Regions:
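Active-site catalytic microenvironments in core metabolic enzymes, especially phosphate/sugar-handling
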Residues: 1-226
C-alpha cells in the first residue's frame, strides 16, 4: 500500500494540526520507498521495537511516542508517529482508557476528559486495577465516594488545576510525583504512563487493519514491581 495513503487514514482521524507546538508528530523517518507491505504498531519506538520490526519483516512502524533523536541504525525503515494529536482527538488515548473501564467521558479542554458518575472509591479502584494492575491510590482525606472524575492518559499533572476548576473530586492520570500526592485534596489514581496509553495501539489497529498487514509490537512497562 502507498504509505502516504496509509498515513492519510491516521491523519483523517487525528489531524496533525492538533499536535502541540513542541511535539514532533508525523514522519520521524521517511525513506525513499513509497509502498509498504507490513506495518508494526507500537507505543514507543526503541531499539528493541526496531529489531522486532526487522525480524517481522515490517517496512514501517507507526507509534504513539515520537523519537526526539534518531539513531543512525533506525534510518532504514519508515517511522510515523501520532502523539499529542492522538491524545486530543475524540476516541484517542484518554477516551480509549476510559472506555476500557466501562465508563463514558466528555471532553473538557484539549486533553482532559470528565466522567460524571456516582461511584465508590472502592468500585472505581477495582475497575482501574483490571486495566492497570499496579495503579496507586492517593486518598489523603479518606473519601468514600466520588461523582466527577477527570482523566488524562499519560502524564497529566499539569492539568490538575483544570480538574479542580471543573469541581472534580477525583483525578486519574500517570506520572504523579510525591509532592503532588502529599498536597492532593481530592482522590487521585496514578495509573502509570505506559498502562494508560498502551491501549492506543488498538485504535491504530482499528484504523488500518483492513488496508494492510499489521503486526502489534510486544511491549512492556519499563517499571517492574519487586
Amino acid at each position: 500500500m502507498n504509505k502516504y495513503d496509509l498515513v492519510k487514514i491516521i491523519e483523517n482521524f487525528a489531524p496533525l494540526e492538533l499536535q502541540e507546538k513542541w511535539d514532533c508528530s508525523g514522519w520521524i523517518v521517511e525513506t525513499s520507498q513509497i509502498d509498504v507491505k507490513r506495518v508494526m504498531i507500537a507505543l514507543t519506538v526503541d531499539e528493541k521495537i526496531f529489531k522486532q520490526a526487522l525480524n517481522k519483516n515490517c517496512d514501517m512502524i507507526i507509534s504513539h511516542h515520537p523519537l526526539f533523536s534518531i539513531p543512525l541504525a533506525f534510518r532504514g525503515i519508515d517511522i510515523y508517529c501520532a502523539h499529542t494529536n492522538m491524545d486530543k482527538v475524540l476516541g484517542g488515548t484518554t477516551d480509549t482508557f476510559i472506555e476500557a473501564l466501562g465508563l463514558n467521558g466528555s471532553p473538557e479542554g484539549e486533553f482532559l476528559r470528565i466522567v460524571e458518575k456516582n461511584i465508590s472509591v472502592k468500585e472505581l479502584s477495582q475497575k482501574i486495577k483490571k486495566v492497570s494492575p499496579n495503579a496507586r491510590l492517593i486518598n489523603n482525606n479518606g473519601i468514600q465516594n466520588v461523582s466527577k472524575i477527570a482523566f488524562c492518559a499519560g502524564s497529566g499533572m499539569d492539568l490538575y488545576n483544570e480538574a479542580i476548576e471543573n469541581k472534580c473530586d477525583c483525578f486519574v492520570t500517570g506520572d504523579i510525583k510525591y509532592h503532588n500526592a502529599v498536597d492532593a485534596q481530592i482522590v487521585m489514581f496514578d495509573v502509570g504512563h505506559f498502562e494508560s496509553e498502551i491501549l492506543i495501539k488498538k485504535v491504530f489497529y482499528g484504523l488500518i487493519k483492513d488496508k494492510i498487514e499489521v503486526v502489534i509490537a510486544d511491549e512492556n512497562s519499563p517499571f517492574k514491581t519487586i
